[in-house]
């Protein structure tokens, strides 16, 4: 069984670019997206759609 560190689909946390709050947890495929993920999501603290980047 593979360990969590070398998992193909790890859990990642998405943080708002503007206020730096970590709002979302999702999974990504490391083979398809080796770079850091960036998505447009709703930030409840900013009360608007902002870019959310993957944090480590």
Curated annotation (Swiss-Prot):
It comes from the Bacteria. InterPro entries: Ribosomal_bL33, Ribosomal_bL33_CS, Ribosomal_bL33_sf, Ribosomal_zn-bd. This is Large ribosomal subunit protein bL33. One of its GO terms (molecular function) is structural constituent of ribosome. Disulfide bonds: none annotated. Gene3D superfamilies: Ribosomal protein L33 (2.20.28.120). GO terms for biological process: translation. Keywords: Ribonucleoprotein, Ribosomal protein. One of its GO terms (cellular component) is cytoplasm. The gene is rpmG. Belongs to the bacterial ribosomal protein bL33 family. Signal peptide: none annotated. The lineage of its organism: Bacteria, Bacillati, Actinomycetota, Actinomycetes, Propionibacteriales.
């Amino acid at each position: 069984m593979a360990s969590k560190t070398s998992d193909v689909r790890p859990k990642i946390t998405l943080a708002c670019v503007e206020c730096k709050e970590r709002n979302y947890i999702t999974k990504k495929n490391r083979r398809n997206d080796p770079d850091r993920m960036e998505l447009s999501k709703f930030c409840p603290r900013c009360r608007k759609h902002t870019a959310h980047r993957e944090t480590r």
